[in-house]
Amino acid sequence: MKIAFIAHHVNFEAGPATVTAHLVERLCEDHQVSVFSNTINGIDLLKVKYYKVPALRCPKSLAHITFLISSTLLLAALSLLRKTDFDIIHSTGYDSAFSSNVITSHFCERECRRLEEANIIKIQCRSVWQKLKALDHRLYRSLLCFVEGLIISRSSSKACIVVSQAMQKEFARHYGDAAKNIIVIPNGVDTLRFHPTNRLFYRDQIRQKHGVSRSDPLLMFAGGDWERKGVRYIIEALPLLSKRNVKLIIIGSDDEKFYGQLAELKRVRERIIFVPHSSNLWEYYAASDIFVFPTIYEPFGLVIVEAMASGLPVITSRVAGAADLIIDGVNGLLLRAFSDVNDLAAQIELLLSNAELRKNMGERARETAEQFSWDQVAQKTLEVYNTVLNRPDLEKLRVNVPERLQKISHRGG
């Protein structure tokens, strides 16, 4: 099969770029794979054909517009010159989605815009620079909402993949019958790289590096876009904990100055460690005791599954897409509401006060994560490709989480 992937970035670091990289890495072994992207890292270019797509790096809105135009023109030119004859053109996002017959959406743009307009997700405007970024963000969101609407309206001629049942429901709510053929394939996790045995190698090393003693309980958060992902709620929960030696490590980049000031206001600044983006997250999972992710909106949340694969108990909100994989109280804990700081503090206290519960929950989390390997994701994606090429009714194909995990519903506030 001749497969082309179109993605702004392809790497093994974070987000949609990681999903694309894992698919490319696996499918190129048995298929002819081409990659159209602005940047690519970690992929053996002897096994794939790479097309560099020119695009601006910033601002975000222009970066996506220029990539959309460039990739569309490049594919059109190659087609006119008869240089390509792809069976599948897979866009992992809305970048050049007009040229593709398979699309993976990692975000319901219309749902995110609804939350922003309702001020549930707050766009920061504390400085002139942030006001300019907010303007760019609104342009970017409007562009992607427009493209998303066009793509979903044409979904009868394309296969549209989303990464969680929550996203499937969001598309149905916003687009009605036009979204009926959407397919759910949850993201995977590298269960060898993210493994409980990493504690033997990295736990003491990372703790010493950041001045955390062996006896200090360590909470972990990882990701960008801290307002959307609920970092403020973790900081607000810290002073409510009975143990004063609980530390929080925040990995990622955002407005560190603001959140540092919030921590000072709550008198917990000395208990928080800010770490810029790390490409070795498995080392930090190994050093931590609990992974906390009280997100306001998260279509999936790769970091949740990575933490589970690492054997960590996870506390997250019910609106996270990866909450599909969690049975509350068995392999993780689900908050009543993302903004319920008292509930968050109580859940943390529950785990910190019971080492046996932490251990058992971490083991069950690992067992769940093992069901979501990237090999399985690649196989399910190939099933979609075959369905597209044979063109039977897409309605018959549904790739969801294991049936036993669907027995408990946890969607809500």
Map each language-model feature to its residues:
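Short, structured helix-loop element that forms part of the nucleotide-activated donor/catalytic region
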Residues: 225, 244-271, 275, 357
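Aromatic "clamp/platform" in nucleotide-sugar-dependent glycosyltransferases that forms part
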Residues: 277, 296
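A short, well-ordered alpha-helix in the C-terminal region of glycosyltransferases
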Residues: 205-208, 343, 350, 357-371, ...
